[in-house]
Regions:
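N-terminal, positively charged/glycine-rich alpha-helical extensions of SAM-dependent methyltransferases
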Residues: 1-26, 30
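Conserved SAM-binding loop
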Residues: 51-55, 60-165, 194-195, 235-239
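Acceptor-substrate binding/catalytic loop of class I
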Residues: 159, 179-196
Length: 240
């Protein structure tokens, strides 16, 4: 079994050069990042009852799955985490390593997928941000992630709900009308409803900890955490 969807990997590999361009094809992720980082930071601090806030993730191991060019990996490292970041696209990892040279951060970037990660290590934190809608076998993917997470570890998943509204906003609006994303970036058939994701996770010893929506404020040009989960949502799970 495998989690890699080669069509998806080829699609993102073609855009790899633009990962760190805030006005390029990954502009939405750059806009998205502050909300994602704050959500993860707050979730980790609350779960592990952390009281040191300068580098709150110190002594915590973190696995960023589907890391792309490292847009989340680098901020996680700055928070003090011992970061391993993986991506099935060789081109993405090359871009991430190249950008890493501009910083003084230490991140272990590996061109692989969770089921092929040759690592006996188990992680305190796992990030699956905007990745589950691009894998070939979601159940197997979640199983592999659970196997890599320590007991009482926390995993974050951000993805798209499978609703009519998500089709209108995330595909028709974002790809065809506003051109925020290249046409074909998303396949609505691969979107997953929160209750379906929760059920899959529960089958692999992952208990939902928190679930929220993320919405775009057109007037402020920023993304915010919200109760509205009809399009984008983010969840955290604790391993039993």
């Amino acid at each position: 079994m495998k989690t890699i969807n080669h069509k998806e990997i080829e699609k993102f590999s073609r855009m790899a050069e633009e990962w760190w361009d805030p006005k390029g094809k990954f502009k939405p992720l750059h806009k998205f990042n502050p909300s994602r980082i704050q959500y993860i930071k707050t979730g980790v601090i609350n779960h592990f009852k952390i009281t040191s806030f300068k580098t709150p993730f110190s002594n915590l191991s973190l696995l960023d799955i589907g890391c792309g060019g490292g847009l989340l990996s680098e901020p996680m490292s700055r928070l003090g985490a011992n970061v391993t970041a993986i991506d099935a696209s060789k081109k993405n990892i090359e871009i991430a390593k190249l950008h890493l040279k501009k910083s003084e951060l230490k991140i272990n970037y590996i061109n692989t997928s969770p089921e092929k990660l040759n690592d006996k290590k188990r992680y305190d934190i796992i990030l699956n941000m905007e990745i589950v809608e691009h894998v070939s076998d979601l159940k197997y993917f979640i199983k592999c992630c659970s196997n890599l997470l320590k007991k009482n570890g926390i995993m974050f998943i951000a993805t798209l709900n499978k609703t009519l509204k998500s089709y209108v906003f995330a595909i028709v609006g974002a790809e065809y009308v506003l051109r925020w994303l290249p046409i074909g970036t998303h396949d609505w058939n691969n979107f997953v409803k929160p209750n379906e994701l929760n059920k899959i996770c529960s089958n692999f010893n992952l208990k939902q900890n928190q679930e929220d929506g993320i919405v775009y404020n057109i007037f402020l040009d920023q993304w915010n955490i919200s109760r509205d989960k009809s399009v984008n949502y983010i969840s955290s799970f604790i391993k039993n």
